[in-house]
């Protein structure tokens, strides 16, 4: 078995491109080799800022042979009445490179066709790779592509060399005017090269030993973490590692060398969030914390070389960071000299969404909506919730957030504390943007949860009124994330209120506006959108789709209750009684769904016991009446597990009813009474789940 190595050498690629390119190269080569019937063992793609390296081990040297049957024209037109081949048969044979006597009749469901057996494969794999490699390189996707020189070829950054080796032989092809070869280039300082690679097996060693490049991203990360931890320990601290920044840093270097720098301790007067953002955002550096968690006047950066004069390089990094921190200190002091009233006034000049008014308008709506939410779930914090809503966006006009927009909300909370606001208000303001994604936590405080819900509901109501509804992958205002955030907060914090009422109240907060959708139409579309997001959330948590639909059809306006009913239904679905219970109660639900609408005036679930003719009718009515007090008590206690357990009490009476009672009898009064008896059953069970949506 053989080894194939291909290295695409480029100018420095952005770190954010690398992970996606690794996946694209791997998937495209896997697909191309599968289509060509070439087998291989392992396929691995690694990257640095200046190279994309593919290694395929245990790859066949020769394409696997296969036989395929190619069908041609129908037999009836392939031969004339005398059985002689027609032009259709001759043309088919010629096209397939076959002799007429090699053709045979293929019988299919559609009739008889002329066909030929063809052997494929047997080509040297090097030939196949020389064809697919340049095609794959040219087709690699980038957020942005560029041209260079006088050619028309486009890529993420200019190509500089291409190495392609099949064992010790060069796989020859041309891409972007560059002819593939057996040479690679190394680190710009420590081993620029070019260096000849004797064979595919020698590639990794050449890159490591001669190029002085750490090809594996995991190895670069390990070198960074181990070296950084050692330097921090010498200073008596620990590095505040951040995974996303670590990923970015390893994508910025080929030869990582951790370097610990210092800054003036006077800068520690700034909030830790400001210091860390200055380091991480602008300098791609990490903070250092003491044992008690407080920041120390040090930072860790990662160099892309081993410097000859470490002290000089360290001094340069410190000088740049000092300038950043001086700016941050200026913003901090300027913001502390301002007050919330002046910021709130400025919000009236900051646009939220042009048709939806200013940020000042939004904070007034949030004040109103937060007060309403608090009245529903926590009346004792109504005033704090309203105040948090009013102050929520004030930091958007602060100097600090203007410079570091990632600190919005966080700085609002910090400034609220410094300016004497209630701690409940300050924490809520700092948590208002949570959760920021599927892995992000929800707000820790109740007031923060209410503010976050209000903010998201206000955005949803406004955008749906303007018909800015997400379609496909397009969601410019992150409305899906807003809906999921509301659902997660309600579920994880155990908040119970009617989401229809939430959206209606949020919609009313906009007052009279020129909407693109009528308010009732927008409200209905928003509710459907929210329920779909809730469904997706439950499915992503591992619940079966049919169970989720059954639970949500029974009611989704109380999100926490819907989740609790789903958990109980999920547990019930694993019991031995589930299958028969579904068949029984689904039958009742389907009868009501199909026949109920045909009854004049509909069905209300009220039946007349004097019209019962069969003992089974009386038994079912009696069973419903017997469990009613227990059912309502357990419903009030949210004991959904016990409620599903009551189905076992009801099922024998329902089964007996269906066995002996003709529901759709001739007498319209008796028929309607029996349908209302079933409606009474379905109404009660329908509060738990829509059994008609379940299947067995």
UniProtKB/Swiss-Prot annotation:
Main location: cytoplasm
Name this protein carries in UniProt: Glycine--tRNA ligase beta subunit
Reactions catalysed, as given in the entry: tRNA(Gly) + glycine + ATP = glycyl-tRNA(Gly) + AMP + diphosphate
A GO term from the CC aspect: cytosol
Homology family: Belongs to the class-II aminoacyl-tRNA synthetase family.
Membrane-traversing stretches: none
Keywords assigned: Aminoacyl-tRNA synthetase, ATP-binding, Cytoplasm, Ligase, Nucleotide-binding, Protein biosynthesis
Protein source organism: Oleidesulfovibrio alaskensis (strain ATCC BAA-1058 / DSM 17464 / G20)
